[in-house]
Swiss-Prot record:
Signal peptide: 1-17
Organism for this UniProt entry: Escherichia coli (strain K12)
A single cellular component GO annotation: plasma membrane
Protein name per its UniProtKB record: Uncharacterized lipoprotein YsaB
InterPro entries: YsaB-like
Length: 99
């Protein structure tokens, strides 16, 4: 009885070891048009200034990154209050999150 289960298990292990490795998948990086990123930054500063009741000149945007088909801009106010602006894949403003 033990031998009947042993041979199929060994055959399975040998076949698994012979399979070719799957190719490594890499995240796609899309280069953002500079004009679009500047427009997104201006919109982010405008929305943050309204949310924090301050002027756009007192808002700093520090990071811009692509994240799962959308974009995020991180920044802070002159009072060191952090926020994140989110944009869709086309660069349209989605929301501002206070951190």
């Amino acid at each position: 009885m033990m031998m009947n289960a042993f041979f199929p298990a060994m055959a399975l292990m040998v076949l698994v070891g012979c399979s070719i490795p799957s190719p490594v998948q890499k995240a796609q990086r899309v280069k953002v048009d500079p004009l679009r990123s500047l427009n997104m930054e201006a919109l982010c500063k405008d929305q943050a200034a309204k949310r924090y009741n301050t002027g756009e000149q007192k808002i700093d945007v520090t990071a811009f990154e692509q994240f799962q088909g959308s974009y995020e801009m991180r920044g802070y106010t002159f009072r060191k209050e952090q926020f994140v602006c989110s944009f869709d894949a086309d660069g349209h403003f989605l929301h501002l999150s206070m951190r």
